[in-house]
Amino acid sequence: MRERQAIEMNDDSWKPRKVVIVGAGAVGSTFAYALAQAGLADEIALHGANRELALGQVLDLAHGQAFFPSVQIREAQAADYADARLIVITAGVRQRPGESRLALLQRNVQIIHDIIDEIVLQNSTAVILIVSNPVDVLTYVAHKRSGWPRGRIIGSGTVLDSARFRHLLSQHFGVDVHNVHAYILGEHGDSEFAAWSMTNMGGMPIEQFCRQCAKCDDWTAARRRLTEQVKHSAYHIIDYKGTTSFAVGLALTQIAAAILRNQHGVLTVSSVLEGEYGLSGVSLGIPCILSQRGVEKVLEVALPADELEALAKSAAVLRQAIAEIHLPLNPSRKPDASEPPRATNNEDRPDGRQPSGVHA
């Protein structure tokens, strides 16, 4: 039995769980730390446009290897795309003073184009996770640019928003967050909405729980307040410390776990829709089953009419943003294989608001 296990471990078909992170700023490095701490990867390769920053992050993380589960941490090379299991793109640029939202979008689209072109050139079989903002638009851009099946290109979507929602509900009702089940759907931005029809406390529908809770006089007003707090919660963090990083790093680790461990977990990642909910030509946050192949299935939840309308409105906002992109979405160039991966680390607000606002 031991001999058979040894043969299987030495089989050339065995692939390490390599994760390449493109972007070495606050989010990329925090995710690398959380990923290493979780013991999800055998190799973590980190790249940043500012090479000195990237090398500093790698060295700082490597000095902690004695305290992590076994993992190799190093600087990424273009060839790492080829055999990576997961490629996480956090790279992006911040808005310049006086710069329009559309101009910012155009610059980030170009960055995604360059990175995707290089990944495709390496014949990668990885799943790509987009974190750069506006995440839903850039997920759609990456999907179109790569020509890959939609399941292999996903965005971080509303996973973090949903976690914030659960936290706020936990605080409001005095229930442990692990017993709160709730989702934010749609755009990772101002048009997102709370799926109250899917919200429950330990299996009890929220409306039923609320009647027994009696913690507030006006549940309708409380619902509005909680939804707005989700949308604006990151502003408070940015006002205090200038950036968000910890919660988004943990959210990305949750997504990575579903993929690297083939968990078939349900998370509200951003996925390109192909007729689900009557929508197509757009990517947004919706419940999806995630496995080692990426999105296995987009779940079509039986949403009530008002939530279906909110989802359609969110999709319309994103379609308008996609329509404003002036760069070609389909593959148009073959980059030089000798080029190193390109990225920026101006990702201090990578979970920043989508086209309809600014949020992290």
Describe the residue ranges of each PLM region.
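A short, basic/flexible loop-to-alpha-helix module at the beginning of a structural domain
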Residues: 2-16
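C-terminal substrate-binding/catalytic lobe of Rossmann-fold NAD(P)-dependent dehydrogenases
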Residues: 146-152, 162-339, 358-360
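Glycine-rich Rossmann-fold phosphate-binding loop(s) that bind the pyrophosphate
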Residues: 24-25
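Aromatic pocket-lining residues of Rossmann-like dinucleotide-binding sites
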Residues: 35
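N-terminal Rossmann-fold NAD(P) dinucleotide-binding loop
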Residues: 28-29
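Rossmann-like NAD(P)(H) cofactor-binding subdomain of soluble oxidoreductases
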Residues: 101-167
